[in-house]
Amino acid sequence: MRSLPPGIDQRSPARHPDWLGPDDLSLKVQEVREATDYRIPIQLKLGAARVYDDVRMAAKCGPDTIYLDGAEGSTGAGPHIATEETGIPLMAAIPEARRALEDVGLADDIDLIVAGGIRNGADVAKCLSLGAKA
């Protein structure tokens, strides 16, 4: 995994160790904004699991973009059961993410970018029609 030799442990936590919940994440978003002098957009990446709740929480933390990766996406680290057998398919996740942004009143302020399982132009058209920005 990630080109490590056999016998070497890979640490790949499910979340960044700097935050335990939404309050910490909100502080980290503000910290990054200040560190970059507000010159770069802040993007939060989410795996599609508890889509509605996770997108609502992330949106309230103040990012410019929420990047949603459907179950068809992957990671460079993690056990097979987590990388291949869990998550919500992208096409099912997009409407939930869009609804969450609308419910917190931020659908016009936060771009929803999606990935994972997009195979062709028809899939791109479906994603856009379901509410993704890109």
What does each of the following model-derived ranges do?
Residues 2, 14-17:
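Flexible, active-site-adjacent loop/turn segments at secondary-structure boundaries
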Residues 7-15:
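Short glycine/proline- and acidic residue-enriched helix-loop micro-motifs
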